[in-house]
Amino acid sequence: MIENKFKNASEAFDFYYGTIPHEGIDFSNTKAMFNQGFTILNPSDRIITNEARNFNIEYAEAEWQWYLTGSPKAQTLGEIYGKIPKIWQDMTDGNGNVNSNYGSQWERAYQLDRVVAMLKDNPDTRQAAISIYDGKEISRYKYDTPCTYAVQFTVVPYIGADGSVIDNKLDMCVTMRSNDLW
């Protein structure tokens, strides 16, 4: 696997935005780069500033709030954002659900709450993970399949220049089947 390190989300976007058109493989109706891994060194600097991204902070916040409700209903996003974007309208099933909604997947078996409790109880655990994709639910993914499969949380030591532990940091490893550049 190729692993790149970037200062922030914008630097990662800029790299892939410049690389995929030239090095990506024609795959189905897109360009793809497989087996990519990267680290964002400053995850709190997560806003992509490249104008090509056409990033809408209000929409991003609304979508995040929707996930946090745990509701798979596209209508819930509409109530938060003021409208239901076409992409989500197109992905709804017959009940108005977006089955790949991360929030409803996190809430399955209270996964997010369990991860927080695990890390509080034992910061050294390597079992603090959330499964987004559930193979038993594959028939529900008729209209949409989650891009993110799993998220693992690990507390790792932050080592200073002298080799001593300065602090602990929460590391998040995300495993995805697909990640849209746009």
Q: What is each residue range found by the language model?
A:
Residues 1-182:
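Terminal, non-catalytic protein-protein interaction segments that mediate quaternary/complex assembly
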